[in-house]
């Protein structure tokens, strides 16, 4: 094991406001958050060969070295280029290669072609990162740059999770079953019991970003919602429960499925969660025996909805989930804060094991308006056809565990650490 990868590298809490503020751990400075976040990305990459870091298993995923370079492009484009006098781009060709989806920043390579980039090599992408890190130093203490730096840190932390889930999917394609990590962490299972009950009424959800250290624009504005009485399970659906769903013909019963979901199951030949094979599943440490008490993960919205129907329950709305989590401590769950393997565990915590599907479409809150300029493309333009997930996963950075956080994916996607928690009316 690379000794550099064994160091404890804690990414900065770019958001510790709201309910997350209950944690007694002091928030690091913005400059410390920047440096530790950038170091963690490199520590993850040190476990990969150049070939590992270049492959792309599907259009939804990206090569590891692309993540490393894209996050550097973000700082170069939105901070160094516009705020550091005399700054020259590291390479004039890189914006075309490493822009993701920002139309205002010009043309870019097609997403499905990212895995064709044999050049620049991994070491060149790392050299790009180090040059950007050095150039950023004069900006780290500037108050006028602080909001964009915080956004860049949060953006990179999101890509750290994507790097892990993308490389997991890529290694899964290899018949040799290669592992990124030597072993999985010890994750004792402490499953919650019973239900969190709420009597309904008027509640407030969302976040006013001006009132906290950082949040994404899609988390606000804070607004009122009307809730009917409901209960939310204290436990995530487990592998054992999912195996019962399979044994009972859950993947063969069209009455349980949404029409689009049933078409997807038949078109793709879906018979189990992604990475399942017999009693084993593929992990970042290769093939392992599946823990029946661990949460069922790598499931799509379609699968989550079908399971809820089979169980005689339903998925929660994002408002229900957020209100139920109002008194939870986001620091209580698992956190991805070092370059070590991650694996979901059953915990009584709402946060930090797997992202949990809700039945809520990812749509703008009342009064939402995206930021001006290219950074306004970060969230708002994706508010179509996707569903909200709550709770953070074992691969999510520490500072992203908060009730107002809105993750989102298309209903067929399942390569992330996604699971479910049941709800019902009362």
Language-model segment annotations:
Residues 133, 137, 195, 202-204, ...:
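A general secondary-structure boundary signal
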Residues 152, 156-158, 162, 166, ...:
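Functional-site microenvironments in short loops/helix caps that host divalent-cation chemistry
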Residues 2-62, 66-135, 146-150, 154-171, ...:
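Disulfide-stabilized, aromatic/cysteine-rich ligand-recognition loop
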């Amino acid at each position: 094991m690379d000794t550099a990868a064994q160091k404890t590298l804690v990414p900065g809490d770019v958001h510790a406001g709201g309910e997350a503020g209950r944690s007694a751990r002091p928030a690091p400075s913005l400059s410390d958050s920047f440096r530790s976040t950038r170091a963690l990305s490199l520590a993850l990459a040190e476990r990969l060969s150049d070939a590992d870091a270049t492959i792309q298993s599907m259009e939804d995923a990206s090569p590891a070295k692309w993540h490393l370079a894209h996050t550097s492009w973000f700082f170069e484009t939105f901070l160094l280029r516009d705020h550091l006098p005399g700054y020259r781009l590291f390479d004039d060709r890189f914006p075309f290669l490493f822009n993701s989806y920002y139309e205002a920043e010009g043309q870019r390579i097609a997403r499905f072609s990212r895995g064709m980039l044999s050049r620049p090599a991994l070491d060149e992408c790392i050299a790009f990162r180090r040059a950007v890190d050095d150039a950023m130093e004069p900006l780290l203490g500037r108050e006028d740059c602080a909001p964009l730096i915080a956004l860049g840190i949060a953006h990179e932390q999101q890509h750290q999770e994507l790097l892990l889930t993308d490389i997991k999917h890529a290694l899964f394609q290899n018949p040799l079953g290669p592992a990124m990590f030597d072993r999985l962490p010890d994750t004792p299972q402490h499953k919650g019991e019973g239900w969190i009950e709420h009597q309904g009424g008027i509640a407030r959800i969302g976040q006013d970003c001006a009132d906290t250290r950082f949040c994404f624009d899609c988390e606000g504005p804070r607004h009122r919602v009307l809730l009917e009485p409901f209960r939310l399970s204290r436990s995530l659906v487990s592998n054992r429960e999912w195996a019962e769903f399979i044994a009972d013909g859950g993947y063969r019963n069209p009455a349980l499925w949404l029409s689009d979901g049933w078409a997807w199951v038949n078109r793709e030949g879906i018979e189990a969660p992604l990475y399942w094979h017999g009693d084993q599943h593929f992990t970042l440490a290769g093939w392992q025996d599946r823990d029946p008490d661990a949460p069922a993960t790598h499931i799509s919205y379609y699968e989550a909805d079908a399971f809820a129907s089979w169980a005689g329950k339903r998925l929660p709305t994002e408002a229900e989930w957020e209100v139920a989590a109002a008194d939870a401590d986001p620091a209580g769950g698992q956190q991805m804060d070092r370059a070590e393997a991650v694996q979901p565990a059953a915990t009584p915590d709402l946060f930090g094991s797997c992202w949990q599907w809700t039945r809520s479409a990812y749509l703008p809150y009342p009064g939402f308006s995206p930021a001006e300029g290219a950074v306004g493309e970060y969230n708002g333009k994706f508010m179509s056809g996707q569903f909200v997930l709550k709770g953070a996963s074992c691969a999510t950075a520490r500072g992203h565990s908060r009730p107002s956080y809105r993750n989102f994916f298309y209903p067929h996607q399942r390569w992330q650490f996604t699971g479910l928690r049941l709800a019902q009316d009362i």
